[in-house]
């Protein structure tokens, strides 16, 4: 009797397994043939401004003109700083000199700006007097991807 129960149980299991396979196969076919919903295209997020290190060497022999044009250049950079487009900026020198020296040995400018691309940076800077008056050497200027990791004000 036990043997008969085992055989009957085996047939029952086989029937259950066969039924389960049929259900799974028909369910898979239904999923495969079900109409798909095309989600609306997701627009790419707008490019976030990033930091860029901008190095502008001066053209040769422009110190007198640089000093003459500086009163028009400086307010432009104050405005760009207030708009938070320029994080920090300043002149580059041949060597350190005493504070207030009217003939400091300028050799260019450096700045960190926040924008989405080099092209946007050039577009924004092209109206600066140092570019229009050819103080900065654009052929040797560099715009480099940059990240400020630490920022600390030096103690005086």
Curated annotation (Swiss-Prot):
Gene that specifies this protein: atnB
Coiled-coil regions listed in the entry: none
InterPro entries to which the protein is assigned, alphabetical: Dimeric_a/b-barrel, Sec-metab_biosynth-assoc
Top-rank taxon, per record: Eukaryota
Disruption phenotype: Decreases the production of aspercryptin by more than 80% but increases the titer of aspercryptin with Ile replaced by Val more than six-fold.
Protein's UniProt name: Aspercryptin biosynthesis cluster protein B
Pathways per UniProt: Secondary metabolite biosynthesis
Family according to the record: Belongs to the YciI family.
Keyword Cytoplasm: no
Stored Gene3D superfamilies: Dimeric alpha+beta barrel (3.30.70.1060)
Transmembrane segments: none
Disulphide bridges, residue numbers: none
Role noted for this protein: Part of the gene cluster that mediates the biosynthesis of aspercryptins, linear lipopeptides built from six amino acids including 2 highly unusual and nonproteogenic amino acids, 2-amino-octanoic acid (2aoa) and 2-amino-dodecanol (2adol). The core structure of aspercryptins is as follows: Ser/Ala-Thr-Ile/Val-2aoa-Aasn-2adol. The first step of aspercryptin biosynthesis is the generation of the fatty acid precursors, octanoic and dodecanoic acids, by the FAS subunits atnF and atnM. The fatty acid precursors are likely transformed into the corresponding alpha-amino fatty acids in three steps.
Key words of the record: Signal
Signal peptide residues on this chain, from the entry's feature table: 1-39
Induction, as annotated: Expression is positively regulated by the aspercryptin cluser-specific transcription factor atnN.
């Amino acid at each position: 009797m036990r043997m008969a129960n085992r055989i009957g149980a085996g047939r029952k299991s086989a029937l259950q397994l066969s039924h389960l396979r049929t259900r799974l196969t028909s369910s898979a076919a239904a999923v495969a043939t079900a109409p798909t919903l095309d989600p609306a295209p997701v627009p790419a997020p707008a490019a976030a401004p990033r930091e860029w290190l901008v190095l502008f060497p001066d053209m040769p022999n422009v110190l007198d003109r640089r000093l003459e044009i500086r009163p028009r250049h400086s307010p432009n950079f104050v405005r760009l700083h207030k708009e938070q487009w320029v994080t920090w900026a300043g002149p580059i020198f041949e060597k350190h000199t005493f504070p207030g020296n009217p003939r400091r040995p300028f050799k260019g400018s450096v700045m960190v700006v926040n924008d989405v691309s080099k092209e946007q940076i050039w577009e924004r800077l092209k109206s600066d007097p140092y570019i229009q008056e050819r103080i900065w050497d654009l052929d040797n200027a560099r715009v480099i991807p940059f990240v400020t990791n630490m920022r600390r004000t030096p103690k005086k």
